[in-house]
Amino acid sequence: MSLLGKLFGMKSVNYQQLVQEGAVIVDVRTPGEFQGGHIKGSVNLPLQSLQGSLGKIPKNKTVITCCASGMRSASAKSVLKSAGYAEVHNGGGWMSLKSKI
């Protein structure tokens, strides 16, 4: 676990296991960014339209958000948690997340 994780009580997440168990990866980058490369099987729901696209994400699934660097995915996590999604993880940048799954 990282120093920041220890300081702020954040637990480490096994993204590979979550994906194997059926987690949905939501990539909140723009369609153009998504077309330039993405994680196989991920769903592209841009942050600016996420609120109107919530019906496309099952509430009974674990959700992992990702973007280019982790900023938009953090915002997306907040949107999803506020909408009642129970298990949501900020996977950060998509390339980093891809290396973890």
Residue ranges and their predicted role:
Residues 2-24, 31-62, 71-101:
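Rhodanese-like catalytic fold shared by cysteine-dependent sulfurtransferases
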Residues 67:
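Short cysteine clusters
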